Amino acid sequence: MQSWSDTALPTVPGAGPPLRLYDTADRQVRPVAPGATATMYVCGITPYDATHLGHAATYLTFDLVNRVLRDGGHDVHYVQNVTDVDDPLFERAARDGVDWRELGSREIELFRTDMAALRVLPPREYVGAVESVEEVVEFVQKLLANGAAYVVDDPDFPDIYFRTDATEQFGYESGYDRATMERLFAERGGDPDRPGKRDPLDALLWRAARPGEPSWPAPFGAGRPGWHIECSAIALNRLGPEFDIQGGGSDLIYPHHEYSAAHAESVVAGRRFARHYVHAGLIGLDGEKMSKSRGNLVLVSTLRKDGVDPAAIRLGLLDGHYRQDRMWTDAVLEAALARLARWRSATALSAGPAAHDTIARLRQHLADDLDSPKALAAVDNWVTEALDYGGSDSGAPAAIAEAVDALLGVRL
């Protein structure tokens, strides 16, 4: 699957400090320690109702990760998937009277357009579930062979499930207790009451073919992949075990990321799926959770059609720390627009205060668990000094503009 167009990054003199990120599994901020090439997998969209601000906040988070790693001298092998085979997609297509493939293609193209407008650096590999079905089939065969998976006793629909007890460390990523897992499993696409399962928390690996649903051939019977196994297969086949960062929204911690890791660790024993599990907070609207069911999604494409500068959307989302749940309001957007205007006014000056210390602080704050609020404040301080008192460094405005572009993804 084709990604979106790349964005040229300005070169900022020197190199940024090593990146430190909060690891959900370890419950602490610790160094990211990649080799020359950093490896990162981020869970992509299910292509309907794209791209709302919750999506945007997640992909901006990992865009910052990408930029900070590059600024630190690393190449970045970034993989992102698209869940273009899933029940919510089929349900939306049926509701709207369109083919699910047509709906998926349309929403994926809109997502690409939104990401390019927000100046999100594209993944090196952008992989759809449909194009990776054969990989999933091979993965399920391995899980069946080593006893980590089983077929339910159902002659009509012999679905294949993952044994939750296949790994001793299951649950290490989320740290949730059994009661919390049971509640979230039911709320987030699980099927705890499916007859024939050995444990209510066992997760679907392969859904046997049903009338009216798409299916693909497999040695164990035609069907389609479960949700979690798609990411396990795509990530392992492109990045290998113990890649540097798995990322997504905090609503993916459980069940999706917990099971993706468990599937992989059942095949590659003794090695963690990823070295860092990193999760972005959720975005609400005017004091309420933003969700499809509430009908209060704010779409990037709608804001763009209304004439909102994508750079302001980006600044508005970066004004809160990535790990915190936060609200989108008119006041947030107005503040972002005002900040963008001030930054552009200051960097358009013929001279300004020296830029070196500001760029160093910008780098340091971003390397410290992506502290974007402090990073924005560092630029604000330079801008205020430039507008209020001027300066004699003729290269400073351009240097600040290039650093803001390269590190924050905001073109001034």
Swiss-Prot record:
Name the source's superkingdom: Bacteria
Span of the annotated motif 'ERGGDP' region: 187-192
**Could you say which residues bind Zn(2+) here?**
C43, C231, H256
Motif 'KMSKS' region: where in chain:
289-293
Give a yes or no for keyword Ribonucleoprotein in this entry: no
Cofactor(s) for this UniProt protein:
Zn(2+)
What reaction is this protein's catalytic activity?
1D-myo-inositol 2-amino-2-deoxy-alpha-D-glucopyranoside + L-cysteine + ATP = 1D-myo-inositol 2-(L-cysteinylamino)-2-deoxy-alpha-D-glucopyranoside + AMP + diphosphate + H(+)
EC number(s)? 6.3.1.13
Give the record's keywords alphabetically: ATP-binding, Ligase, Metal-binding, Nucleotide-binding, Zinc
Q: How is the cofactor bound?
A: Binds 1 zinc ion per subunit.
- CDD domains of this UniProt entry? Anticodon_Ia_Cys_like, CysRS_core
The molecular function terms of the Gene Ontology recorded here are: ATP binding; cysteine-glucosaminylinositol ligase activity; cysteine-tRNA ligase activity; zinc ion binding
Binding locations of L-cysteinyl-5'-AMP: C43, G44, I45, T46, T58, N81, V82, T83, W227, G249, S250, D251, I283
Q: Looking at its record, which EC class is this enzyme?
A: ligase
**Which terms under GO biological process does the entry name?**
cysteinyl-tRNA aminoacylation; mycothiol biosynthetic process
List GO terms (cellular component aspect).
cytosol
Tagged with keyword Metal-binding: yes
Free-text function comment from the UniProt entry: Catalyzes the ATP-dependent condensation of GlcN-Ins and L-cysteine to form L-Cys-GlcN-Ins.
The family this protein is said to belong to:
Belongs to the class-I aminoacyl-tRNA synthetase family. MshC subfamily.
Q: What does the record note on quaternary structure?
A: Monomer.
The name this protein carries in UniProt is L-cysteine:1D-myo-inositol 2-amino-2-deoxy-alpha-D-glucopyranoside ligase
Q: Which gene encodes it?
A: mshC
